[in-house]
Every structure is written in C-alpha cells, then in structure tokens.
Amino acid sequence: MQTRNTFSWIREEITRSISVSLMIYIITWASISSAYPIFAQQNYENPREATGRIVCANCHLANKPVDIEVPQTVLPDTVFEAVVKIPYDMQLKQVLANGKKGALNVGAVLILPEGFELAPPDRISPEMKEKIGNLSFQNYRPNKKNILVIGPVPGQKYSEITFPILAPDPASNKDVHFLKYPIYVGGNRGRGQIYPDGSKSNNTVYNATAGGIISKILRKEKGGYEITIVDASNGRQVIDIIPRGLELLVSEGESIKLDQPLTSNPNVGGFGQGDAEIVLQDPLRVQGLLFFLGSVVLAQIFLVLKKKQFEKVQLSEMNF
C-alpha cells in the first residue's frame, strides 16, 4: 500500500513539473516571439497592406532607416543577391523582456515579385554562402514563396542580411514576363512596443491612466512598480502597473495629468521600409543588343579601313 502511494506521489509530481514547464515555455515564447517580423505571419495573411504599409510597423512604432541593394537587371533562372541593410549604433543596449539590458536583434521581411523565390542550396555559390552565414530564411506562407522573413538574429553580426534569390524563367512559368518589377523590404532593430494582441511591452512609454495625486509607489519584488493615483475631486483610486526595466519620471505626492508619461522612453530601436526595382531581362534582347553593338563596331572598323584605303589612293595619284 505504501509503495503504491509512493508511485502515485511521484507520478503526480512529474505531471505537475511537466505542466509548469510547458506553461513557462508557452508564456516566454509568446512574449518574445511577437516582437519580430517573422511572427507577423501569425496575425496577417499578407505583410503589406493595401496602403503600402508593412504590418511590422504596427508593433515597432519608431521610424528608422532601412536600405536594399539588388542588381538593376537579372537573367531568368539565375541566382542573385538582395542585400538588406539595417543600420544602427552598435553601442546601444535595449531593455529585454526580463528588465535587463542587452544587445539589439534585427529582423527583416522581403516581398519579391511573383515567381521570384529563395534560391535552393545547390544553386548558391560558396562566396554567397559565406555572406549569408548561418541565417535561416523562411517563407511567409507555404504558398507565398516570394515573401521571405528572417529574425530575430544578432544585430551586431547581421546588420546586413544577404538573401539568395532565384529569378524565375518565363519559359517554364507562363505567369512571369520580361518586365520591370518592384521589390519591397521592411527591417527592424530592437524589440517592439506593442504585441499583436494590443498589449504593451516593457520597451515603450507608460502614461498615467488618470489624473490626480500619486499617493503611493510600490516597488514589486520581481521588478516593476504599482503606482496608485488618487483623483482629488472624488477620491477614486487608480493603480497603474509599470513592468520591470523602466525608469520612473514621477514620485510620491506629485500631481499628474491624464496621459502624462510615468516613465522615460526606453526604446532605442525601430522599423523602416523601402523598395527597389529589378528588370527580368530577356536573353534574346541581350544577344540582339550585343549583335547590334558588334555590328556598329565592325562598321566603324570598315569605315576607318576604307578611309585609309581612299587616302592611299589619293596620295598615289598626287605622286603620279
């Protein structure tokens, strides 16, 4: 009987430990993941809205620059580089989810024309593989191979991200034509200010939800604050919760107004978007151009030779 109770107790403890670990994993994963471009796919069918705005800007509120470099023209069924540059001051530190300071991560979303896609590994040259490093790109959706996402990755190592892109071949894909196409890119550095569910992260400013007198500021054991605001007109109390990692701008006894900042702005990152154009060139046009240029060069050569021959004839007639 005692042995059976012992086994039952062990089984209950193991089950409880697994449940707690699973809950911690889910909570931690959700709080971290929702701050980067790669996880916009959980909430948006298409990362680019009809207005042209990339949805990552809904969570990363600060505007920062981003740049993209692609060739002016590419031939069908060839691999080329799309280099996304996400510049920022490498000395900056951001507030992490645990309230501590840490290095910034970066992420990007690349929206290619229909038919363009990530190049398969066997088509990527050793030189290009060296530029790519250990990055692992993903499709935004299984059926959207022309939209690629990456991140979060260490910003100090990958402030320039090289995407290996395979150009389509109109000969095998009738939906693709030899035209000029737009390419759109979005890139962020640092954590977002708002999660997809609308809640704030600890990487943004917290404002007072009511006006009045700050009667109490309680520092919580695991970090963060509880600020009690008393409305002087009716005595109603409002408690604002400040997460860990933020610096307070107010003190007890201070009179504040509605929406007045209670904390400084910890955000040192931001999101930016840009675009570029690329021409899918017909090889026959290139061959025709080369033939035309060759014809012009040959014509010039024959003209020079003819001129010299004419000058020799004139010279011989004058001597005669």
Swiss-Prot record:
The keyword Transport applies. One of its GO terms (molecular function) is heme binding. GO terms for cellular component: chloroplast thylakoid membrane. Pfam families: Apocytochr_F_C, Apocytochr_F_N. The chain crosses the membrane at residues 286-306. Keywords: Chloroplast, Electron transport, Heme, Iron, Membrane, Metal-binding, Photosynthesis, Plastid, Signal, Thylakoid, Transmembrane, Transmembrane helix, Transport. It comes from the Eukaryota. Residues 1-35 form the signal peptide. One of its GO terms (biological process) is photosynthesis. It is found in: Plastid, Chloroplast thylakoid membrane. Its cofactor is heme. SUPFAM superfamilies: Cytochrome f subunit of the cytochrome b6f complex, transmembrane anchor, Cytochrome f, large domain, Rudiment single hybrid motif. Heme binds at residues 36, 56, 59-60. It is a single-pass membrane protein. Binds 1 heme group covalently. Gene3D superfamilies: 2.40.50.100, Cytochrome f large domain, Single helix bin. The 4 large subunits of the cytochrome b6-f complex are cytochrome b6, subunit IV (17 kDa polypeptide, petD), cytochrome f and the Rieske protein, while the 4 small subunits are PetG, PetL, PetM and PetN. The complex functions as a dimer. PANTHER family: CYTOCHROME F (PTHR33288:SF10), PTHR33288. Component of the cytochrome b6-f complex, which mediates electron transfer between photosystem II (PSII) and photosystem I (PSI), cyclic electron flow around PSI, and state transitions. Belongs to the cytochrome f family. HAMAP family: Cytb6_f_cytF. This is Cytochrome f. The gene is petA.
